[in-house]
Amino acid sequence: HAITKLLHYAGNTEVEYIRVGTSGGIGVEPGTVVVTKNAFMPNLEAYYTTYELDQRIDTPTNLDHALVERLLAAQPKDIAFPIVVGNSIAADDFYLGQCRYDGAMRARKDADYRAKFFAKVHELDICNFEMESSALAAFCNRAKIPATMIAVTLVNRFEGDQIKSSAEQLVEFSERSQQVVINYLLSRKDLSN
């Protein structure tokens, strides 16, 4: 809210929000950059629930597809890492919400259930788990601000919960998401002055 209000008071009317981060991949290899077109809750609903006092408000969690296309168009053809466009699941937390087995408490669903769930969501073009996309999408939809998410994957959840990449690889992976945004910003002729 605060940043959006500041931008409004400063007279910035043509803003775009791009969240940059990391995620757990679902059927994509570590180091893949996922550009999110739609955010889903873990129940596979494409809305985010908030409350104003006692009133429930369900806000759609679709992100701006035109912004996604502009981001992709700004990338060099010979970019040295994979970029995919897909959907994301916003889990409630890092461990249980993603059915991980390496937290302080073990997830209640067994490995067979989890594997079937991952296969099901992968068929729905869901490429990653993270925790912010649905809230960001709902906020930006209500505020009528174009938005998307860019998150590099650190692990393929089909292969386990543990990150196996080296510290150097993780730094390089994180820089990939940032590079996608930098390429986009450099392509914007209206920002060159």
Feature locations, PLM:
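Non-transmembrane, aqueous-exposed alpha-helical and coiled segments at domain scale
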Residues: 4-15, 123-126, 185, 189-193
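Active-site rim beta-loop-alpha module in soluble metabolic enzymes
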Residues: 58-123
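Metabolite-binding pocket within alpha/beta catalytic cores that recognizes anionic/polar moieties
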Residues: 1-73
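Zn-dependent metallopeptidase/amidohydrolase metal-coordination segment
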Residues: 134-169
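Glycine-rich beta-alpha junction loops
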Residues: 24, 87-95, 135, 143, ...
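His/Asp/Glu-rich mid-to-C-terminal helical/loop segments that flank catalytic regions of hydrolases
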Residues: 157-193
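Short coil/turn connectors at secondary-structure junctions
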Residues: 11-15, 29-31, 43, 79-84, ...
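Generic non-transmembrane alpha-helical segments
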Residues: 70-78, 139, 180-188
